[in-house]
C-alpha cells in the first residue's frame, strides 16, 4: 500500500473526502514540521490553520474506520519550511505527495518526486441552499439561528432561516467547505487573513469568517450582489450625464452602508470603459464584478506607495477607489487627483456634506475644488442628491462687511443651481455653513469675537441698543482676565464704541 504525504494545501482542499470516497488510497502521513507550522498559525489566530487542524482530526477518524495507517513522521528539529522537509522525506522514503498546490506540483516534477494532484469534486456549496433571488446576505453564527437579509438596498428585512441554532461544529464545517472551494471556483481568492479573521472572494460571494478571540464565537457573513445595473438604469438627470462625460474628474460617491454605493461605482466604471476610457480600481476586498478590460488592484497585496507608482505609470483616465476609510486612502486619492488622474471615491456617509467633511479636515480649503468637483449621494439604491463644488472670492452669506471677503468654496445643487453650503475659514476654523442659516455678523462683531474667543471659546458677541454685548458663560468668567480687559478698552477707545460684559444663565 502506498504511503501518502499530505501538505497543507491538501488539508485545506478537504482531502478526507477523497480518502473516504476511495479516490485516493494508502497510508496517511503528515510531517511533524507541518503540524508545528499549523500550531503556530493557530496560536496566531489564523482561521485557515484552525480549519487544517480540524481536517487532521477528521483524517485520523476516517483512517481508523477504513483500517489504514495514520502516522506523524519526520524530524521536527530540522530547520526549513514544512513543504521542503516533506519533499526531502518523500525523496528518502519513496512516498507520494498529495497536494492541491500548483507550485508544489511543479517542484515535485522538477525533483522527480511522485505526487497526486487533487482534482475538484463536483459538488455544490451547502450554504447556497440558504440563498434565493432576493437574498442579499447570509449571517451564520454559532449558537444562533441562521438569518438572511432579503430585499434590495434601502428596502430589506431580516428573516430567520431555521428554528434550530447552529452548533460550532456546523459553522466550522461551512467555513471548511468555503476554504476548500477557493481553489475550485474561478475568480476566487483569499483577500485578507489576519488574527481571528479571514476575508474571501468566492466567485460572486464575499465571505467574512471570524473566530475567537476576535469574535465571541465562530461567525460567517456571506454577501452577494442582488442587482447589477448599467448607468442607464439609474435614469440620471441629463445634466449629470453631461457632467460625468465632460467635466467630472474628482467624484465622490457617498451613502450609508448597504445603500448601493459600490453597485453605482461599478456601473460608472463600466460606463467610462464603454466611452473608451482606461479604468482601474483599488478595492479591499476586490468584490466588484467588472469586465476583464478593467484592472482591479487589491490594497491588501500592495503598499500605498506601490499603488501610487503603478497608477501614475499606467496612466488610467479614471481610478475607482472603493471603500475609502483611513488617512492613507484619502491621501492616495488626493495625490492621484492632484497629479491629474480622474478619481471616483466611495465613502460611507449619512449625508453628502459628511463626505465633504472627510476632506475638509485633511486638505487646505484652496485645494478642495481641485480635488472634488462632484458629490453623488446614493440612497436606497438611487441617486438622491448631486452637489458640485466651485471656488470664488466673496463675502460669505451672512457676513455683512465688504472687507470680510475671502476665498469661499460654493457647494451647489446640480439640479437647481442654487448654492446650499459654503466652505470658508472663519477665525482659524474651516467651516461648512448652510447658506440659509449663515452666520450674521458685522465687521466689528467679528473683530471682538476674534479677540474674546481666543481666551473664552464659548463666549458670544451681539450688537444691541448701540452697544456690543459679550455674553460669557458663568463657569468661564474666571478666564476674563486683565489682559483681555485692556485689549477691549483699547478697541473701545480706537473705534469710539461701547463694549458691555454680560453673564449667561
From Swiss-Prot:
Its cofactor is Ca(2+). It comes from Saccharolobus islandicus (strain REY15A). A triple mutation (Arg-147-Lys/Ile-199-Ser/Arg-206-Ala) forms monomers rather than hexamers where the PIN and helicase domains are in very different positions than in wild-type protein, see PDB:5YWW. Homohexamer; the central pore (25-31 Angstroms) is large enough to hold dsDNA. In PDB:5F4H two of the 6 subunits are in an ATP-binding competent conformation. Interacts with Holliday junction resolvase Hjc; in the presence of HJ DNA this interaction decreases branch migration but not Y-DNA unwinding. Interacts with helicase Hjm (hel308) which decreases the DNA helicase activity of Hjm. Residues 493-505 are annotated as: Required for maximum interaction with Hjc and Hjm. Changing residue 261 to A: Loss of ATPase activity, does not unwind HJ DNA. Its EC number is 3.6.4.12. Ca(2+) stimulates ATPase activity more than Mn(2+) or Mg(2+). This is Holliday junction branch migration ATPase PINA. Changing residue 322 to A: Loss of ATPase activity. It catalyses: ATP + H2O = ADP + phosphate + H(+). Disruption phenotype: Essential, it cannot be deleted. Transmembrane segments: none annotated. Residues 434-505 are annotated as: KH domain. It is an enzyme of class 3 (hydrolase). It comes from the Archaea. One of its GO terms (biological process) is DNA repair. The C-terminus (residues 434-505) forms a novel KH fold; this domain binds ssDNA but is not sufficient on its own to interact with Hjm. It is probably destabilized in the homohexamer.
Amino acid at each position: 500500500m502506498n504511503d501518502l504525504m499530505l501538505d497543507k494545501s491538501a488539508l485545506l482542499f478537504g482531502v478526507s473526502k477523497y480518502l473516504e470516497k476511495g479516490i485516493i488510497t494508502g497510508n496517511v502521513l503528515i510531517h511533524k514540521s507541518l503540524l508545528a507550522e499549523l500550531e503556530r498559525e493557530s496560536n496566531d489566530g489564523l482561521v485557515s490553520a484552525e480549519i487544517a487542524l480540524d481536517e487532521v482530526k477528521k483524517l485520523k477518524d476516517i483512517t481508523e474506520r477504513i483500517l489504514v495507517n495514520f502516522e506523524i513522521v519526520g524530524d521536527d528539529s530540522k530547520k526549513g519550511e514544512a513543504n521542503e522537509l516533506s519533499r526531502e522525506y518523500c525523496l528518502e522514503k519513496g512516498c507520494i505527495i498529495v497536494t492541491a498546490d500548483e507550485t508544489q506540483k511543479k517542484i515535485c516534477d522538477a525533483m522527480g518526486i511522485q505526487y497526486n494532484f487533487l482534482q475538484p469534486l463536483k459538488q455544490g456549496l451547502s450554504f447556497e441552499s440558504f440563498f434565493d433571488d432576493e437574498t442579499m446576505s447570509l449571517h451564520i453564527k454559532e449558537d444562533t439561528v441562521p438569518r438572511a437579509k432579503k430585499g434590495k438596498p434601502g428596502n430589506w428585512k431580516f428573516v430567520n432561516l431555521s428554528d434550530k441554532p447552529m452548533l460550532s461544529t456546523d459553522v466550522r464545517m461551512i467555513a471548511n467547505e468555503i476554504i476548500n472551494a477557493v481553489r475550485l471556483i474561478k475568480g476566487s481568492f483569499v483577500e485578507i487573513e489576519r488574527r481571528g479573521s479571514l476575508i474571501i472572494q468566492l466567485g460572486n460571494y464575499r465571505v467574512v469568517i471570524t473566530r475567537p478571540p476576535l469574535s465571541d464565537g465562530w461567525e460567517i457573513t456571506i454577501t452577494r450582489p442582488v442587482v447589477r445595473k448599467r448607468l442607464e438604469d439609474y435614469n440620471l438627470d441629463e445634466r449629470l450625464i453631461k457632467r460625468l462625460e465632460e467635466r467630472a474628474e474628482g467624484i465622490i460617491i457617498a451613502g450609508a452602508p448597504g445603500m448601493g454605493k459600490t453597485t453605482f461605482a461599478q456601473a460608472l466604471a463600466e460606463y467610462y470603459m464603454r466611452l473608451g476610457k482606461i479604468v482601474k480600481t483599488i478595492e479591499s476586498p476586490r468584490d466588484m464584478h467588472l469586465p476583464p478590460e478593467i484592472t482591479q488592484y487589491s490594497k491588501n497585496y500592495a503598499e500605498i506607495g506601490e499603488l501610487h507608482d503603478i497608477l501614475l505609470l499606467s496612466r488610467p483616465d479614471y481610478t475607482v477607489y472603493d471603500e475609502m476609510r483611513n488617512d492613507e486612502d484619502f491621501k492616495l486619492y488626493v495625490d492621484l487627483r492632484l497629479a491629474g488622474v480622474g478619481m471616483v471615491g466611495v465613502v460611507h456617509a449619512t449625508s453628502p456634506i459628511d463626505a465633504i467633511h472627510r476632506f475638509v479636515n485633511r486638505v487646505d480649503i484652496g485645494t478642495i475644488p481641485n480635488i472634488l468637483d462632484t458629490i453623488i449621494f446614493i440612497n436606497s439604491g438611487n441617486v438622491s442628491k448631486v452637489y458640485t463644488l466651485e471656488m470664488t472670492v466673496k463675502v460669505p452669506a451672512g457676513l455683512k462687511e465688504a472687507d470680510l471677503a475671502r476665498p469661499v468654496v460654493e457647494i451647489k445643487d446640480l439640479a437647481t443651481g442654487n448654492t446650499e453650503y459654503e466652505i470658508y475659514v472663519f477665525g482659524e476654523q474651516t467651516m461648512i455653513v448652510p447658506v440659509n442659516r449663515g452666520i450674521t455678523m458685522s465687521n466689528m462683531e467679528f473683530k471682538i469675537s476674534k479677540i474674546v474667543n481666543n481666551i473664552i471659546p464659548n463666549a458670544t458677541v451681539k450688537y444691541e441698543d448701540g452697544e456690543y454685548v459679550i455674553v460669557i458663560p458663568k463657569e468661564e468668567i474666571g478666564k476674563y482676565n486683565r489682559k483681555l480687559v485692556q485689549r477691549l478698552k483699547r478697541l473701545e477707545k480706537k473705534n469710539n464704541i461701547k463694549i458691555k460684559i454680560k453673564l449667561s444663565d
